[in-house]
Amino acid sequence: FLIIRRPIVLGLL
């Protein structure tokens, strides 16, 4: 879950 959430945050940045 956290692993999937990390890429999403980086993508927004």
Curated annotation (Swiss-Prot):
Residues modified to Leucine amide: L13
Gene Ontology MF term list: toxin activity
Protein localization: Secreted
Chief location: secreted
UniProt keyword Secreted, yes or no: yes
Biological processes, Gene Ontology terms: defense response to bacterium; defense response to fungus; innate immune response; killing of cells of another organism
Keywords, in A-Z order: Amidation, Antibiotic, Antimicrobial, Fungicide, G-protein coupled receptor impairing toxin, Immunity, Innate immunity, Mast cell degranulation, Secreted, Toxin
A GO cellular component entry from the record: extracellular region
Tissue expression as described in the entry: Expressed by the venom gland.
Family: Belongs to the MCD family. Crabrolin subfamily.
Function: Mast cell degranulating peptide. Shows antimicrobial activity against the Gram-negative bacteria E.coli ATCC 25922 (MIC=30 ug/ml), the Gram-positive bacteria S.aureus ATCC 2592 (MIC=10 ug/ml) and the fungus C.albicans ATCC 2002 (MIC=12.5 ug/ml). Has little hemolytic activity. Its mast cell degranulation activity may be related to the activation of G-protein coupled receptors in mast cells as well as interaction with other proteins located in cell endosomal membranes in the mast cells.
The protein's name in its UniProt record: Vespid chemotactic peptide 5g
Native organism: Vespa magnifica
